[in-house]
């Protein structure tokens, strides 16, 4: 027996079977950095149509988590796909660098600003800390394979950014959107500052729920309101509240003049309740022997005076539109400095706006009975006092959704303070923002209704904060009238110039007379800007200024929580400063959860860190998981899910390796065969690749990365692995190395690889780079500078052996394989090359299959295949799942060719080559080798 190994075209490639990504990827990343690959992309695509994905800044505090990784990877995939489509698609990362979380970290080390450390030194430490955090996060983002302008990102603490925020504020003031107000705002007693809507999160809280008796001072007036001559017992208005601590600030009781109210007798006193709530309220009180004495309309109660339950204070009954008879008692406790509706009612009726609660959450010195106590701790004292005064009608506990600080996770209070607001009404900002939302494309589509509803319902945006590490609100107000300085716009531009040179410290360290002359009449505002104003200004501070970008951005892509965060603040800043929206399209992705749909938390032990993933499996596995998941809803990840992703990756890598290994010896400059001269199956492979490429590009354009991933996987495992590559192995390995059949297949493989590597590049960025290095090519460009492959061809209308034809062949082949498997299990054959396959076909199937002539056997990977009319079917044939098709499989008794392993009667016919078939002899001894037309 001779050794024919040297006569075979054995596969060979530098592209390894094992990914070994955790070790290889850092080397590839290092190569990109040495090449300056991002800069080369910018130079190569300069002058092309722009596509700008604007980066929402992550907060510069702590290591990145898998949610950060998902966000950056999705952005990177989209930007890279747009580059492949020929766009100039820059990506400039940004970071959010001011605010409380950084202050808290610095406080841990240095103490509070103004106590153990000066405010100036504190700011320097904050800046230093933020810079360190940016570098930590940047390293992780780069390791994920994300390309961008990492050497010059935008930081909200850059002097130029801080200065441009002040200029943006100037435009907002110029457009008359800024107002000063004394209003109740969400207040965090731990932060000692007001919070914006985006900084508030709602969690369940158990609160005391009490019904309080307010004694009616004028019983005669009350009797008259109910159509009675007199009342022989005391009467009480009953309010229900879950915030007993606000009772010291009570100034009124609100009723609705459109509701009906009942006077109810209980033993020796009367209570007033909304008529529709009498039954359920008495049931709540467990009172059975009460009697409704009379009913009246709410408007008749207006103006009646009650007495505060523990202060000598008259409390009027007033009308409030917000009062309903859905729950409670239909009479609402009104503390103007602790609620939005209460405040509005207080302003309407000139109620006292005395502040009883300080910024630290403790009652002020002028709060009788409770001075110095923390409000939530005072709840018990208030309830106890009400009991002593016999003013507590009922006491329960209620579990309800309550606002909490996003950072401290502690309950907030509503507290009226003087603050600066962007008014939603003053210049029609609300309506303009809603119109802009309608002009923007939102995906998923429910995002539009969500943000629209939020804008419709949101209060004025409180943009002032009482913090140390933040961009100042550099205003001067009159010491007596508190009006803004008449030259405010000019002053702000002067401040911006100073900040551009010396950062925010230049404002805090400057004297007032550096900005204004009338320091005796005007005082500076000491507040800082809400950090959401920082990130919300990015369209004005980056897109509107950086000439390498464009305004508005083509795309904003963030997590679904940003409808109430960055999407909204960006819109409000842009609309109030510039008058149009900052984005054309807004996409959101879901949150990352574990495989059971639970939020990730250290306490549950279900945290999957991106660092662990890329240090073990590789960043490309994380990228593939991200792309494969439909990110419009929650994205589940776990070790098991990532293991499945790694299995998918292996299949893709193996396909790429098989393709590359069969391009050994192929020179694209001399060996490419024209499409119409290719073996028909190779024509199909190219046309099928073209069909998939069209779908893949369409999916990329729609940002449907999961569809892209599915298409690539299907292409590799089904169209290639289970069909085309399986069939061409024989031709690739055994045909003459430079003969037409092999060069035809290599031409198809060359085109397939060039298309496939580009499809993969946005998702499997490291692997695509590795594939590209091992690919024969006619260009020196790195894969990152390439565009979609354009040398693919489709069948024309005259081609009989078109995609439809081959789809039917694939269907028939699947049935043949099914029956071959049956015969393997029955031990009739061990391998398909031992089989003789006879297909009995009806007229339509016969006409289809006879087009392949004697090459049908190559498609079926058998040594012998024949076609007969269905009428000739034998009892040995098996009916297939295709109508009009029976299949018979018999074992071939002919000898095995030691070179191609086919069974053939021609083995031994050549005296020089006794153990191989005539086809192999032809491939070894003749100049042209065998010929193929179809397969």
From Swiss-Prot:
Needed co-factor(s): Zn(2+)
Motif ('HIGH' region): 58-68
Residues involved in Zn(2+) binding: 897, 900, 917, 920
Principal location listed in the UniProt entry: cytoplasm
Free-text remark on how the cofactor is bound: Binds 1 zinc ion per subunit.
Listed EC numbers: 6.1.1.5
Top class in the EC scheme: ligase
GO biological process terms, semicolon-separated: isoleucyl-tRNA aminoacylation
Motif 'KMSKS' region mapped to chain: 599-603
Location in or out of the cell: Cytoplasm
One Pfam family this sequence matches: zf-FPG_IleRS
CDD domains registered for this protein in UniProt: Anticodon_Ia_Ile_BEm, IleRS_core
Record InterPro entries: aa-tRNA-synth_I_CS, aa-tRNA-synth_Ia, Anticodon_Ile_BEm, Ile-tRNA-ligase, Ile-tRNA-ligase_type1, Ile-tRNA_ligase, M/V/L/I-tRNA-synth_anticd-bd, Rossmann-like_a/b/a_fold
Homology family: Belongs to the class-I aminoacyl-tRNA synthetase family. IleS type 1 subfamily.
Functional summary from the UniProt entry: Catalyzes the attachment of isoleucine to tRNA(Ile). As IleRS can inadvertently accommodate and process structurally similar amino acids such as valine, to avoid such errors it has two additional distinct tRNA(Ile)-dependent editing activities. One activity is designated as 'pretransfer' editing and involves the hydrolysis of activated Val-AMP. The other activity is designated 'posttransfer' editing and involves deacylation of mischarged Val-tRNA(Ile).
Domain notes for this protein: IleRS has two distinct active sites: one for aminoacylation and one for editing. The misactivated valine is translocated from the active site to the editing site, which sterically excludes the correctly activated isoleucine. The single editing site contains two valyl binding pockets, one specific for each substrate (Val-AMP or Val-tRNA(Ile)).
Oligomeric form and interacting partners: Monomer.
Designated name of the protein: Isoleucine--tRNA ligase
Species in which this protein is naturally found: Francisella philomiragia subsp. philomiragia (strain ATCC 25017 / CCUG 19701 / FSC 153 / O#319-036)
